[in-house]
Amino acid sequence: MMNYVKSLGTYNTRNMEKESSKDLVQNEDTPLPVQKISMSLFHEIVFVFIACTAQLMTQAGLGQSIAPNNIIGKSLGTTNPGQLSWFPASYSLTVGTFILIAGRLGDIYGHKKMFVLGYIWFCIWSLISGFSYYAKSVIMFDVCRALTGIAPAFLLPNALALLGRVYPPGKKKNLIFALFGATAPNGFLLGSVFSGIFAQLSWWPWTYWTTAIVCIVFAIIGYFAIPHIEADEVEEKQKFDYLGAFFGVSGLVLINFSWNQGPVVGWQVPYVYILLIIGFLSLVVFVLVEKRVVQPILAPSMMNSEMGCVLICVAAGWACFGIWMYYLWQFLENLRFATPLLVTAQLTPVGISGCAAALTTGYLLKRLKPTKIMVVSMIAFTVGTILIATAPIHQTYWAQTFVSIIVTPWGMDMSFPAATLMLSDFVPKQHQGIAASLVSTVVNYSISIGLGIAGTVETHLNHKGVDLIRGYRSAWYMGTGFGGLGVCVAILTVFASYLKVGQQKSPKFPLIMKNTKAV
């Protein structure tokens, strides 16, 4: 697929040379050249580092919701599995929901501004999340975590857009995007380690207060380290689609809320399925609005079949990952009776394996099409989940559990860079924020809604909480189904790419006649 992307870049460059006299505002699909930014080596290292912290802190925030999950729940007066799953789900919900809007705002007002504001917002709501301990309310904590999730929604797409605009397609860009992807498992591990230390040995609110301190430091570094990128004429004339934003966010929030609230109160409660229906209707209205507005949040012209298939794979794979991670933690704590710190230690290979996967992906992207890399990543998600789903409770950690922890990060760090690079190189410069948003939206939203679906399966099959292992295995089997779907779609995408190449090499007779007639 990388060759496909490069060929598209060559094709579009030729088009730019032919149509350079056209007005860029009227032809927004014309890719604009990457701005040349002069930076010293130290400045460039700091810039790449602060951009990668966006992914690091996003996944650290998820780790903070999962590692001390049971300790936080007990301090707030709940041990209900459905309510506990809301801790990570509420965070991932807003991360995935607001990314598209944040990317669009970055395109309009500047990616650097949105990036710095994202860290300031992260700081504020991390502070409040810690103080929610005094409210002794699960709902209060969930709301705080949901509002905290808006911050990574601003960080991720704008960080990726900044990298996409500073670096042209090439080896350096491939390496940087691979490093960006490598921070995902290490960010989760870092968040889990510190939250486990504070929750088990001190006091869990310090997890969030420490995060607030780190975020304000990153905001200051970002303000000085991120280079100034001049807005072009196209960006200055862009406007925000408020109507599309309203229906898009409403639809995504209501659908996700329904799926995650169903396991808590039961699907027989009227407001759960009513909100689900309203959510789907809102998304239908969103699609209709986007087709009619002049400057939509998600331009229909940006999408094609190849991109759609890749995004489906990402959604299926990361839904599988969210289920794998959450229930692995519950399995190790509740059935193998490990402490949060011991579980974190057992998950340490995730970071090492993730780095190896990211570097390998950066190497493979120069030699294989991203569609093939996507197949491998989906297989990694699926195999990792199958291994833990079939692991006996009293089996040694070094058997299936360890292998599962080694294999699964390859799904994370192969799928994210491949999908992000393809979209970043494909779309025009003024849509870099939206391109970055698409992958990040699908990743985080699928984690949240995947947990909701798995939670529904778990609560219906664990015999009202008596048979924990049956509920956990059922959730993992649901995750395996998601992973299998990703494998199938990825394989179909590979075949489709070969068919497309074959058709291009052997044009049919009617096409020749049509071109002859035009001449």
UniProtKB/Swiss-Prot annotation:
One Pfam family here: MFS_1
Entry's Gene Ontology cellular component terms: endoplasmic reticulum; membrane; plasma membrane
One MF annotation (Gene Ontology) recorded for this entry: ammonium channel activity
UniProt lineage: Eukaryota, Fungi, Dikarya, Ascomycota, Taphrinomycotina
Family: Belongs to the major facilitator superfamily.
Chain ranges passing through the membrane: 37-57, 82-102, 114-134, 146-166, 175-195, 209-229, 240-260, 269-289, 309-329, 337-357, 373-393, 402-422, 434-454, 475-495
GO-annotated biological processes: ammonium transmembrane transport
UniProt-recorded name of the protein: Uncharacterized MFS-type transporter C1683.03c
Keywords associated with the record: Endoplasmic reticulum, Membrane, Transmembrane, Transmembrane helix, Transport
Organism of derivation: Schizosaccharomyces pombe (strain 972 / ATCC 24843) (Fission yeast)
Xref: InterPro entries: MFS, MFS_dom, MFS_trans_sf
Protein's cellular compartments: Endoplasmic reticulum; Membrane
Topology relative to the membrane: Multi-pass membrane protein
